[in-house]
Amino acid sequence: DVENEMHPEWPIPLPGVMSAILVSMDDKYLYLNNWLHGDMRQYDITDPHKPVLTGQVFLGGLLGKAPKVNGVEVAGGPQMFQLSLDGKRLYVTTSLFSTWDNQFYPEIREKGGVMIQIDCDPVNGGMKVNPNFMVNFGQEPNGPSRCHEARYPGGDCTSDIWL
């Protein structure tokens, strides 16, 4: 369960909004995004009846818990994501749907979206933002632009192009 959290600008507790989930190729980990809160989570689902939170990082979001990445304050929250076939790299984008982006994250109009790499430990669990990787779509020549979904050349955990 993702608990609602209090927010000073909301009259009700801020709900968690998950728009995607992904299971690693070895069926050990489940990943989910929490678009409004701003976090990505990794759960060990070896026992699917008792998932264990093994990793959590914040990227943007409305709770103000996210650090800057490469000196950039992330606009939006974690939305679509792709996991490498070896389970070591999770690529996360920050635009859900432009109408919703504009409502909840109006700063994304000027800043644009980003794609961030999260380094994952596929053996012991755990996640950390890679401080050396960011694609800043706000700096595009005709931008600022937003990024919704990325595909991994050669295959990822949610497509069958690697077969």
How should these model regions be labeled?
Residues W35, S95:
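Short loop/turn segments immediately following the C-termini of beta-strands
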